[in-house]
Amino acid sequence: MPAYRSKTSTAGRNMAGARSLWRATGMKDDDFNKPIIAVVNSFTQFVPGHVHLKDLGQLVAREIEAAGGVAKEFNTIAVDDGIAMGHDGMLYSLPSRDIIADSVEYMVNAHCADAMVCISNCDKITPGMLMAAMRLNIPVIFVSGGPMEAGKTRLANPVTKAVEFKKLDLVDAMVIAADPAYSDADVAEVERSACPTCGSCSGMFTANSMNCLTEALGLSLPGNGTVVATHADREQLFKRAGSRIVELARQYYEQEDARVLPRSVGFKAFENAMTLDIAMGGSTNTILHLLAIAQEAGIDFSMNDIDRLSRVVPQLCKVAPNTNKYHIEDVHRAGGIMAILGELERAGKLHTDVPTVHAPSLGDALNQWDIVRTKDEAVRHFYMAGPAGIPTQVAFSQNTRWPSLDLDRAEGCIRSYEHAFSKEGGLAVLRGNIALDGCVVKTAGVDESILVFEGSAHVTESQDEAVENILNDKVKAGDVVIVRYEGPKGGPGMQEMLYPTSYIKSKGLGKACALLTDGRFSGGTSGLSIGHCSPEAAAGGAIGLVRDGDKIRIDIPNRTIDVLVSDEELARRREEQNAKGWKPAKARPRKVSAALKAYAKLVMSADKGAVRDLSLLDD
């Protein structure tokens, strides 16, 4: 039987000093025979997705202690990608994922915690904590702060002048601000309305995509990805996480049941998570993160697996930014992630024999939580939790219910396989001479008219140069904007390109241009935006050999992307570039700190999840 890890610092005469310090934190004699549960919070006042988490760690802690455990809370850092976007702050976003993973490892191992509850929410926090969970391999439950309510306003159409009701999110504020057809008053109205409450941004952006994927991985409770942050029902997720983690700890340490450990989910759960992501048209960042999490779990899950799944998994859900009709609150009304997983199971696309933290298997969970099949009225009531439309930064502050569930599987937010938005899913891996190790595109956000696209390269050496050229009308219809030396090494930090793609849309070029980068995209990106080009330019990738005017052909149905230049010419250019060194052709006014330089020394390209190259640490 595995010994409680905490006994390392709480048992035996020689640990009297450590016990004395534990007592100084409030522990009593009886507590030394209980599991010590780390409550890993990520509260910060910088991030709307985390601003309401301050007291929620203690909410979980009280439930842990009521269930017979000892709770010890600590915090991680959290970067807001939206606030860091468009300037050098974005260089720190992806590296923060690894800092979060390391900090959780440091705290949990240093203090010998037996299990943990991870309170996450936004872009790099959930994947960072997932990486730590797999690395540590102790019982864990994830509970997120929840999605923001969608913004809502009435705005005059700049063309028809008719006043229209609009559902909004962060991306609308960016696009409208760059569109001269809208007045300053319009921009101010959208700015004030787009992000009305606490929570992670309201579309299927990276944060919500990752929180939804924790349900598919079996590491969170049903509803974790979709109950809005403001709703009282989310409080029950926090309370149940606190009591359930004590049960899981006892199940492992006292009953030797290793099925409760995060690594036990195995390859099948990673396939389920990616299948869900493809079916719901999630953020391309999830590919980066799942690859990294799988490496921490010691699971051989690769771009080849993602490519294979993308060809056979249907798109069953379409949410902002891929449509302005639905946001995460609408996914919840349609039955949430369990409903999408239920449709995937009926389509024969899901492994149901994987464990979860709340049911013996995913199949058992679906029998209770899939609203199409459940007989539990409490489950149906749960999925009627909706937005209140009241601006607030307070969690659990409203109890609004939708008047009905969205059970329309033909034309609703979630579709059945027979009525899928498309028979192929919302994400695709492309390969070709410009991306030998692959690149990714969110096909859910690409108009059908440009699924096959050939255009002329418009080469830029940074995101800043790309933005300047787009705003100054140097980018024309038919261009493929190349943004290079923005990969994990080249940035460093692999910046998100939400501003360039938003400005392309605001210029009316959303269906007339493509953008290719070795950087990445915000989950809020749509259009023909292709990222994670691997190898990246700084690692000698062919994206660094493209020149202005080169023809580039993109063929999403056939999963190819090529620069239409002969192999001989590419070889000649490579010799030239080897002599010059793989660095931007133009100087960039970019301050790269020692911390970022250290990150760049170890990081690998996006096709490996932008994780550290641990071989460089071998003796």
UniProtKB/Swiss-Prot annotation:
Modified residue N6-carboxylysine is at which positions?
A: K124
Under InterPro entries, the record lists: Dihydro-acid_dehy_C, DihydroxyA_deHydtase, DiOHA_6PGluconate_deHydtase_CS, ILV_EDD_C, ILV_EDD_N, IlvD/EDD_N
Q: Known EC number(s)?
A: 4.2.1.9
Q: Which GO terms describe its biological process?
A: isoleucine biosynthetic process; L-valine biosynthetic process
* Keywords assigned: 2Fe-2S, Amino-acid biosynthesis, Branched-chain amino acid biosynthesis, Iron, Iron-sulfur, Lyase, Magnesium, Metal-binding
* Subunit structure, interactors included: Homodimer.
What residues does Mg(2+) bind to? D81, D123, K124, E496
This protein's gene is called ilvD2
Chain sites annotated for binding [2Fe-2S] cluster: C122, C201
Task: Provide a GO CC annotation, any one.
Answer: cytosol
Q: Which Pfam families match?
A: ILV_EDD_C, ILVD_EDD_N
The answer to whether keyword Iron-sulfur applies is: yes
UniProt lists the family membership as follows:
Belongs to the IlvD/Edd family.
Name of the featured protein: Dihydroxy-acid dehydratase 2
HAMAP family the UniProt entry points to:
IlvD
Q: Which coenzymes or cofactors are required?
A: [2Fe-2S] cluster; Mg(2+)
Read off the NCBIfam families from this record.
Answer: ilvD, PRK12448.1
